[in-house]
Amino acid sequence: MIRRLEELVRQCNVDDYRIVECTTVSHQAFFVKQDLDQHRISDTTHVTLFLYVDKEEDGRKLRGQASREFYESQSDEEILKQIESMKFQASLAMNPYFEIPADYKYAEERKDYKLLDVLKTLVSAIQNVKDTKTEKINSYELFVNEYYYHIVNSRGVDVSFNTMDEEAEVIINSIDGDHEIELYHRVKFANQPLNEITDGILEVFRYAKDRTKAKPTKKMNNATVLMTSLDNGDFFRYFLAKTNAGMVYNRRSQTKVGDDCQENSKGDKVTLELKKELPYSANNLPFTTEGVPAKDITIVKDGVYQSYWGDQKNSYYLGLKEAIPANNYVVLPGSKSIAEMKQDPYLEIIQFSSFIMNPMTGDFGGEIRLAYYFDGKEVTPVTGGSITCNMTESLKHIYLSKETRQINNCVVPKTVQIFDVAVAGEE
């Protein structure tokens, strides 16, 4: 279909085009408790055309674009008619001119991921988790997907590759007398070792047990907070948002390369690197669907912004030599062990009901689903209440743990220590 569509669009006098073909093969399994309820297999192909129309206005070169999906069942006449309609749509919304990627050639031999075998391994990992008297698996859904991409454009890009990912969604119930709670656990990865998948669910079992015994969070001023949450990945995405070419071009971020976001700060300096590949990541794509190659690059080094990243259009607007995707990222570990962080009183947040990070204002926080409070003598599980912080203030005094953890496409410090936090809670 992709070659046929390319031949047809060449007949329509467009200035540039890009075609993306994505075939997705998916194995899905749905379990009630540990019993298989349904197994589904799907195989779908989507072909999307992006076309670009240029014109000059008041001495400025402009470019409009439009996109739509096409199907094998469509006739040539129908496709040509829709392409002409797309050209008209593109001409109605013109933006400053930008170039599309050019001259990338990449043809990767299609890998056989043996999806059914991968699914069986994933099932085994979860069935290794045995119910206890108080903690039980309610249900779970598993997805194992292969994606085959073929991308061509009018500037000589012709790349093809395939990749895969796995996803597990598990609901766990925990009962303590008449009190029952439910926890939702969702993870995404690729080829993660079986024991690590099992250990992740067992960890949620332990947290579920503690949640049923949790006391209300007390109101605190100037608390030391340890963030040991799966939301730590989103915490560090703040730095990606601040350096995103689209955010910068549209003036939603004022960040400039060379700015020091931790000038005169105490504690650890943040270093964040983009990685083309990361073991067990579901985002190991050699190219974006724009036809831009992935690469390794440092975005922040010791608190100083080093580079922007982003899509082709906004990178071109900023005058960057090339667009850089953020498939995977790594935040380097800090100077303190978690044990050192726990020597003095703290509130360690394990789960938020919903973690929110506003990269424009730097505000972040959320309602506490499960945390552990250490008063200097004993540790008590707590729930409820919330924290509200600001990144600019938090970066003035912050420590990152020596220990790291991988959360799908990122490796980040397992615990982040921040200070002077106002905790809303029970009086």
Region spans (language model):
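Active-site bordering "gate/hinge" segments
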Residues: 1-277, 302, 414-427
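Dual-mode signal for accessory low-complexity, basic/Gly-rich regions
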Residues: 259-427
